[in-house]
């Protein structure tokens, strides 16, 4: 039997002394604010993508309280319902191979409801200035 190459404890070693890792919300927010200011955009859009299991609401709260965005969007508000997602993925899980199922032809957009996405886009387009924060 082949040994699994699944890494249960993945990590990335950071050795660049010019760009150290930041710990703590105050330091993270200050660095983000510096980057936003350098861009000199009237309507900067900051998107924070999260790994599964991350407390997105905590990230949203911490960044909102420190960056004071004009508009805050939690991407989960545009997801299809869990029932709809179950229906979407069910054909790919029904297989003779109970461990791996079948390869899926779905893409990320399949998991979102088009109406909230268009609503968010309209709201962003109508905003003339100020930071837009999207988390999720």
Model-derived regions: residue spans:
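Structural recognition of the conserved hydrophobic beta-strand(s) that form the central parallel beta-sheet
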Residues: 131-136
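ATP-dependent small-molecule kinase phosphotransfer cores
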Residues: 2-29, 58, 68-130
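Glycine-rich P-loop/Walker A and Walker A-like loops and their local beta1-loop-alpha1 context
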Residues: 18-65
């Amino acid at each position: 039997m082949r040994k699994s190459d699944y890494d249960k404890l993945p990590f990335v070693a950071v050795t660049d002394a010019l760009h150290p890792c930041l710990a703590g919300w105050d330091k993270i927010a200050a660095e983000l604010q510096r980057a936003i200011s350098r861009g000199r955009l009237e309507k900067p859009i900051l998107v924070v993508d999260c790994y599964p299991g991350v407390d997105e609401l905590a990230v949203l709260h911490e960044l909102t309280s420190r960056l004071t965005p004009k508009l805050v969007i939690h991407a989960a508000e545009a997801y299809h319902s869990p029932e709809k997602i179950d229906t979407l993925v069910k054909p790919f899980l029904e297989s003779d191979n109970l461990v791996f199922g079948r390869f899926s032809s779905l893409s990320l957009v399949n998991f979102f409801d088009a109406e909230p996405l268009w609503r968010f886009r309209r709201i962003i387009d109508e905003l003339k200035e100020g930071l837009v924060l999207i988390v999720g």
